[in-house]
Amino acid sequence: MKDSFTVALIGLGNRGKDAYLPEFLKYGGKVRVTAIAEPVDEKRNEVAKLLGLAPEQCFRTGEELLAGPRLADAAVIATMDRQHVPQAVPALQKGYDLLLEKPVSPSLEECDLLARVARETGRRVVVCHVLRYTAFYKKVKELLDGGAVGQVMTVQAIENVGYWHQSHSFVRGNWRRTDESSPMLLQKCCHDLDLYLWLAGKSAKRVSSFGSNSFFNAAHAPKGAAARCLDGCAAKADCPFDAEKIYLTNAATGIDAGNDGWPCEVLAAHPAHDSVLDAIRTGPYGRCVFACDNDVVDHQVVNVEMTDGSTFGFTMTGFTEHNTRFARFFGTAGELSADLLSGDITLTPFGKPAQVFHIDAAEGHSGGDAGLVKAFVELMLGGEPGSGLTSLDVSLESHRIALAAEKSRLAGGAAVELQ
């Protein structure tokens, strides 16, 4: 066992700076951040000051950081989807172990390339499929593995993206276009697909899918809608997607309600009423949701046939009040429902009373962010990798399913065989 290790952070956005860095700092001297890369000067300078880094430890891009000698034992790659593999390959070749943000890549060829380089270099890659690391889903796994419902025959699951999250990230935000990021099912739900395969202990054989961007387009703009929410929009009062409501006044998401975290921290490095208002006035997050250049889906369904003949139905939709997940597992001896919003896991053995297990939610993907970093720290310090560790090889099946589903969707729902 090692006493400590060093890490380089590539990408200081919502995941790198706001999710993972605070978790690493909880480990004190066991984890030291020795290099950072971030193109936004304000973010880079702020983190450099926090960590006491010298100028030669700070870079504008991951490419600049990786061009020189190795600066840490491990690297966290938390950049945009299409940057992951072009940065991860040279990082592995330089000798870094990796904590890699999802998705690995929208290209299966790149996924396979990265897996090959990881094998050739003998380096470790952990993919940020954070849901496996929550106490909630670990309990679901314990019950299912213990035979609580018998053999799982059918899984039904839904990701409630949330109306404001859909508009924030996938209509106005960085993940609104497939050509700039990846298909929405891959970017948003690859860790859901990974989760349910792991929970049920299954592998996929065949996939079909339907979905589209049916609503967030010009055809659905209400009468009197303006190009920007602050440009005298006549539909503003009745529009739930109004940027002022989401970022200023909404009780759950608005800065005026005291929410200076996500999503407001995406609009301004130090969110306050004036800085958020200015971002709405001048930036992409103030655009009308019916006048953006988005092309990713706003809803999608996926049907999966497993290799053992069991089935999995998954729905992703942006048309929900809450941002949460719900699943049901139907087995030969009972059924189990998992409601992440309430924290309740309800087990109903056939012919017997139901049992309810309550798991209190935690911050950061219900505690998944903290659990992921803990598992990575333990791995880097020399501990044994846990059975739920989301290694690269394990994680790629979810990517194959997501990309097969996108292929099916674009082909009108035709079934796609998985190799």
PLM segments and residue spans:
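Beta-loop-alpha module in the N-terminal Rossmann-like domain of NAD(P)-dependent dehydrogenases
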Residues: L53-V117
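C-terminal helical cap and adjacent loop that interface with cofactors, partners, or active-site loops
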Residues: L51, D295-Q419
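Rossmann-fold dehydrogenase core element
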Residues: L113-V130, G150-A157
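Glycine-centered short loops/turns at secondary-structure junctions
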Residues: G95, G122, G147, G309, ...
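C-terminal capping/lid region of NAD(P)-dependent oxidoreductase domains
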Residues: K2, R123, G150-T154, K407-Q419
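Predominantly a Rossmann-like dinucleotide-binding segment in NAD(P)-dependent oxidoreductases
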Residues: L131-Y285, G412
